[in-house]
């Protein structure tokens, strides 16, 4: 069965995490029997610089909000949803390690980062004896293969990077619902 539940602060402006949290609570499953992830970057509706990105304030507050919405004590995986050119990578790596040390997250990763950005995070982590990102969540399907199959090939070996992909059916394009004409009302 399914035991991995992927979430993000931006999905329905946080409402999807509330729904997921209610389901997890209602089901009463042993917490060790499933994996829950969340992602931070885009925020959950706020537009101020401290409500977006990978700065320390936003990452810590977004993690706390995700834990509350999901009604869990920790996240198994916590992703930096996009790279942040406005925040030094050192600040992001330090903050993610702070969240690990606090027991709020077990592992941290990235989503839609380049191999170079991931390696930079690992170099910073190594320099300061911290934990670098352990997984990347790229788009991967028959239309988007280069990053997973070529760009990341070396870092799989170098740092043991794992992946959890998104959009394996290319947002529905690879299903039969798009054979012929596009159905009315689709994106």
What spans do the regions from the language model cover?
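A short acidic, helix-capping loop that chelates divalent metal ions and anchors anionic groups
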Residues: 43-50
């Amino acid at each position: 069965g399914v035991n991995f539940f992927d979430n993000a602060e931006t999905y329905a402006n946080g409402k999807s995490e509330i729904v997921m949290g209610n389901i997890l609570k209602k089901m009463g499953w042993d917490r060790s029997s499933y994996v829950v992830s969340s992602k931070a970057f885009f925020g959950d509706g706020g537009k101020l610089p401290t409500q977006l990105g990978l700065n320390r304030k936003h990452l810590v507050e977004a993690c706390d909000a995700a834990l509350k919405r999901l009604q869990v004590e920790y996240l198994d995986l916590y992703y930096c949803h996009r790279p942040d050119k406005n925040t030094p990578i050192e600040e992001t790596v330090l903050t993610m390690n702070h969240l690990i040390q606090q027991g709020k997250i077990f592992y941290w990763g990235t989503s839609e980062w380049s191999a170079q950005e991931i390696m930079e995070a690992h170099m910073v982590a190594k320099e300061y004896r911290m934990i670098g990102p352990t997984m990347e969540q790229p788009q991967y399907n028959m239309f988007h293969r280069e990053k997973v199959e070529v760009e990341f090939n070396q870092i799989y070996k170098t740092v043991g990077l794992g992946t959890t992909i998104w959009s394996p059916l290319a947002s529905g394009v690879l299903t039969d619902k798009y054979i012929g004409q596009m159905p009315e009302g689709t994106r």
